[in-house]
């Protein structure tokens, strides 16, 4: 079934307009040159982009800008890498890559679980999907047998309902938000594994593709068992050591983040008006959120019956936990997952909520309806701040509670747009998934929504958003954190916290990051290697370069050095950038301007904590110098 060591050597071309399903074979050198995963997806997207020029005639329903992302001809890719189908720890991954419906530029976003392994073991490096079906369909893959099945009866189903309805090893589906082209929609697998960023659920919906299911019986093929298994053994030994010494990550995953992030002034609070959990009104601190109560440690104390709920295959870390609640829980949830840090912050502290138990309902709503937790938190916090400032458009209000604008939930309850209201996130997301009234504007995401409000009311709503290139900021505030802003600004997808890291990410507060630029570029290329193999970022510490290289070479038969892999990764990083620049040229905007962070992060200082009084750079001159140095080292023109 596999044509080469380490690679099935083929992808499935799916034309939804015609119903055509074709095997497209890849040569071994192309596979090695692009590694796999993100690298292969980038290569295919940038060299085999099927987007018609007429796609630019489509206009975004809220902003009026060119909107080629949801045109039928725009391709949607789902790819695996050499580590899928292997025993390499923490390799339960797959990448979704397309033109983002949220930002209209390059997006790569990742899922955990078993889907990536099973797709590869079924005999496919990945999927290249284009066109649009006249009716709702689903793609069924059983090893090399592939078919399109009618899915009209599944229209309107949540992702949980889809997974229950389809008999397969793995199901990857959208909920009603994706069907409704909500620009922050996410496809979901295993009930809670989201391809979260960039609105790729709307990419599925625009193609009338409800789900992809995979069943596999195949086995992998490796070049050198001794080299490959030796690398796996070293990785497992390191992971075992970490567990034995009590590394809390192995028990709590990212959910301990609120405690650390608040101490370091990195945790978004009340729509990025603070970063320590402190709430301010008129310049005065009025409340301190309980970050311990918001953390996963409290979640476990409150739910002693909660258990480690398994892991992505195969992963010794097993960083998640779940709880099966009693009957009568809102939204009829069969099992509740412990939220990740990004969710605890964006649907917690960012909304003035400081209980991880309250955040669960919002998290589960995101998983059911298929929306991104980060962008959901950004959107809801924007609307709450609009209401707080008196900038809430009159035509949006469906009622008031004590003078605060409110909406009517699907159950008929009036819900106020106010910070600190734990009922707000799940019920607002339920309305967003099937948008009507004001929710048709909210469906565009926070940035598009702020632009609409500014255009229609004159209020400077765009100054209230935290983003780069239209992608909502993750739950790590860059102000006063040396080099963090540059990592967000130079990332091809927009603000993303998983594409770069520094050995000392905090450094000296409010000092220039100019000397960190070489390290930033190296780290970005390193992330391309990891995301092409594909390896979970949580395993990076247990997978040093020698282990990574030996695992890759042992699986594929290549003789690559880490330097070779960095050269390949650098090429892919630049290819994605060039693809973005070509888009910006078509719509008449300057690339350098697109790289800048939003107003809130460049102009609004933090009010307290170790970064009090600081913004994302020392000053505008420092920002410009850092960006120019980055362009120089990347070999980019200063205007691109």
Language-model regions: role of each:
Residues 166-198, 204-640:
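Extended C-terminal regions of large enzymes
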Residues 1-292, 300-305, 368:
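Basic, polar low-complexity surface loops/patches
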């Amino acid at each position: 079934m596999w044509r080469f060591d380490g690679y099935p050597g083929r992808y499935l071309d799916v034309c939804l307009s015609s119903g055509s399903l074709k095997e497209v074979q890849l040569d071994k050198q192309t596979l090695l040159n692009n590694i796999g995963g993100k690298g292969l997806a980038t290569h295919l997207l940038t060299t085999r982009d099927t987007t018609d020029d007429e796609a630019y005639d489509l206009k975004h329903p809220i902003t009026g800008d060119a909107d080629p992302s949801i045109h039928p001809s725009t391709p949607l890719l789902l790819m695996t890498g050499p580590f899928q189908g292997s025993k390499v720890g923490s390799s339960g991954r797959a990448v979704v890559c397309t033109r983002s419906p949220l930002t209209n530029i390059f997006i790569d976003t990742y899922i955990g679980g078993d889907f990536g392994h099973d797709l590869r073991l079924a005999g496919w490096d990945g999927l290249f999907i284009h066109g649009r079906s006249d009716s709702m369909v689903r793609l069924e893959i059983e090893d090399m047998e592939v078919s399109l099945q009618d899915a009209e009866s599944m229209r309107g189903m949540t992702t949980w309902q889809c997974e229950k309805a389809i008999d397969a090893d793995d199901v990857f589906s959208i909920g009603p938000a994706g069907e409704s082209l909500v620009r922050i929609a996410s496809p979901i697998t295993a009930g809670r594994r989201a391809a979260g960023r960039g609105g790729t659920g709307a990419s599925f919906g625009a193609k009338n593709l409800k789900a992809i299911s995979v069943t596999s019986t195949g086995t992998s093929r490796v070049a050198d068992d001794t080299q490959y298994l030796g690398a796996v053994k070293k990785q497992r030994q390191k992971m075992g050591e970490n567990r034995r010494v009590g590394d809390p990550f192995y028990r709590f995953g990212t959910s301990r983040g609120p405690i650390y992030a608040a101490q370091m002034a990195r945790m978004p609070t009340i729509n990025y008006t603070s970063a320590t959990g402190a709430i301010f009104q008129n310049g005065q601190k009025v409340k301190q959120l309980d970050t311990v109560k918001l953390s996963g440690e409290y979640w476990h104390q409150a739910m002693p019956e909660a258990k480690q709920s398994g892991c992505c295959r195969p992963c010794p870390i097993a960083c998640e936990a779940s709880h099966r609640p009693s009957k009568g829980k809102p939204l009829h949830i069969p099992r509740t997952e412990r939220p990740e840090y990004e969710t605890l912050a964006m649907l917690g502290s960012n909304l003035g909520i400081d209980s991880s138990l309250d955040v669960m309902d919002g998290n589960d709503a995101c998983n059911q309806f298929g929306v991104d937790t980060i962008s959901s938190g950004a959107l809801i916090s924007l609307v709450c701040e609009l209401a707080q400032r008196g900038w809430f458009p009159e035509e949006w209000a469906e009622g008031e509670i004590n003078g605060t604008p409110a909406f009517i939930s699907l159950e008929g309850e009036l819900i106020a747009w106010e910070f600190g209201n734990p009922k707000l996130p799940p019920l607002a997301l339920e309305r967003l998934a099937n948008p009507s009234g004001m929710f048709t504007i909210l469906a565009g995401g926070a940035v598009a929504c702020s632009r609409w409000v500014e255009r229609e009311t004159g209020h400077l709503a765009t100054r209230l958003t935290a983003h780069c290139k239209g992608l909502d900021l993750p739950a790590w505030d860059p102000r006063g954190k040396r080099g963090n802003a540059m990592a967000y600004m130079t990332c091809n997808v927009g603000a993303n916290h998983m594409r770069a890291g520094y050995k000392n990410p905090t450094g000296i507060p409010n000092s220039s990051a100019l000397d960190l630029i070489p390290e930033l570029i190296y780290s970005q290329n390193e992330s391309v290697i990891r995301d092409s193999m594909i390896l979970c970022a949580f395993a990076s510490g247990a997978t040093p370069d020698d282990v990574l290289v030996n695992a890759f070479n042992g699986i594929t038969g290549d003789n690559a050095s880490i330097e070779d892999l960095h050269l390949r990764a650098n090429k892919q990083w630049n290819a994605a950038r060039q693809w973005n620049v070509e888009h910006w040229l078509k719509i008449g905007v300057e690339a350098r301007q697109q790289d800048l962070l939003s107003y809130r992060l460049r102009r609004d200082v933090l009010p307290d904590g170790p970064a009090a009084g600081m913004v994302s750079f020392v000053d505008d001159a420092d920002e410009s110098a850092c960006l120019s140095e980055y362009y120089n080292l990347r070999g980019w023109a200063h205007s691109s």
